[in-house]
UniProtKB/Swiss-Prot annotation:
Species whose genome carries this gene: Corynebacterium glutamicum (strain ATCC 13032 / DSM 20300 / JCM 1318 / BCRC 11384 / CCUG 27702 / LMG 3730 / NBRC 12168 / NCIMB 10025 / NRRL B-2784 / 534)
Post-translational modification: Glycosylated; by Pmt.
InterPro entries, sorted: Ig-like_fold
Stretch list, region Disordered: 41-66
Gene3D superfamilies cross-referenced by the UniProt entry: Immunoglobulins
Protein name: Uncharacterized protein Cgl1651/cg1859
Biological process terms in GO annotation: carbohydrate metabolic process
Signal sequence interval, chain numbering: 1-29
Gene Ontology cellular component terms for the protein in this record: extracellular region
Keyword Secreted included in the entry's annotation: yes
Domain of life: Bacteria
Keywords: Glycoprotein, Secreted, Signal
Compartment annotation: Secreted
């Protein structure tokens, strides 16, 4: 009687085999279910694995990269958490930024940009992994008038104008309703 190969499950004879937890046991259609079953341990699979195939390539998404157009960003590296990357590429990094073969993103953004870019890492075997990196490059707010930190007191003159307009509107409504009331009597 011949058994199946554990990895290929190809019939080598007339018996069928079921593989469970690395043990191959014969199984027949007319098998006595109360009979004692002996199991044979299969040979270890000593097939060498292809380089880079043992660990899949996996990347970790860094936090949002922020900055101001015209000022260099603090370099950020895309971290490889599984496998070993040989190169990094991106076709849609914001203008002025570069990524090197270690996954380090550097440069100076040329214009405002808020969005993401796809980073692709490749290992020696050609296996690719991708991650999306978020960017937020905006102009700094103008500092013409120093802010006190409270929007309620920053423009007190505007608040005074608004309150005066509301009081005037209420006075007009009360005056009109009084005249209307006396007219209807």
């Amino acid at each position: 009687m011949k058994l199946f190969s554990r990895t290929s499950l190809v019939a080598l004879g007339t018996a069928a085999a079921i593989t469970l937890s690395g043990v191959t046991a014969p199984a027949f259609a007319d098998e006595d279910s109360n009979a004692a079953v002996s199991a044979l341990k299969t040979a270890e699979d000593n097939t060498p694995e292809a380089p880079g195939a043992s660990t899949p390539l996996k990347l970790e998404q860094p936090g949002t990269i922020t900055g101001v157009p015209g000022k260099a960003i603090t370099p950020v590296t895309v971290k490889v958490v599984a496998g070993e990357a040989e190169s990094f590429t991106s076709d849609n990094l914001p203008s002025g930024l570069l990524i090197d073969n270690t996954g380090k993103i550097t440069g100076t953004p040329k214009k405002e940009f808020t969005g993401s870019a796809k980073i692709i890492a490749k290992n020696e075997a050609g296996v690719e992994a991708e991650v999306y990196v978020n960017f937020d490059f905006n102009e700094e707010p103008s500092s013409e008038e120093p802010s006190s930190g409270s929007s309620d007191t920053d423009n007190i003159e505007n608040w005074i104008k608004i309150i005066t307009a509301v009081i005037g509107a209420l006075t007009t409504i009360l005056t009109f309703s009084t005249k209307l009331d006396s007219f209807l009597k």
